[in-house]
Amino acid sequence: MAICLVLSRTGMEEETPRPGVIVISISDPGDPLPLEGWDKVFRFEFDDCEEREAVLAQVTRRRDGSFGKVVAFTEDMAKKIMKILEDHPTEDFIVHCNAGVSRSVAVGRFIGEETRRKVLFRGNCLSDVHANGLVLRLLHRQVWLRS
């Protein structure tokens, strides 16, 4: 049975590259994690925000201390994740974000629901209780639109 491992940025940095594993790398805008050695890495850059409409005009502080406009998860990103799942029906996945608690948990939970992969949470996250609602809603919307 294929798995989906969900972890934090720190957890991902500690992982040893494995052939055939699909990595969905979620980071804050402008702060991607270098992932040399992994075969297939799909990068998404968006902030951990819940409601798209409420945050589009807001500014957030980045890890490097700079400020930037909040970037929310979008329908286009959800479509890309759906395509990744379609293109890789049997491979193991690793999904990470900075904390490994909200964004990556939402994507990992969705992967488990839609593909019946076993989802394993490691590090900061022990369950999917803090899964990002906006990410889940837009991914589930893609399923609904395709049915």
Predicted regions: what they are:
Residues M1-D47:
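Glycine-rich, flexible N-terminal cofactor/catalytic loop recognition
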Residues E13-R18, I84-H88, I111-G112, L139:
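Alpha-helix C-terminal capping segments
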Residues R18-G20, G37-K40, P89-E91, G112-R117:
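Short glycine/proline-enriched coil/turn segments at helix->beta-strand junctions
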Residues S25, I94-H96, F121:
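A structural signal for short, well-ordered beta-strand segments and their strand-loop junctions
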Residues W38-E50, L126, H130-L136:
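Adenosine ribonucleotide-centric catalytic and binding domains
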Residues F42, F46-I94:
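Helix-loop module immediately N-terminal to the HCX5R catalytic loop
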Residues E86-T115:
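Catalytic cysteine-centered active loop of the rhodanese-like fold, especially the PTP/DSP P-loop
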Residues R109, T115-S147:
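Cysteine-dependent PTP/DSP-like catalytic domain, specifically the C-terminal lobe
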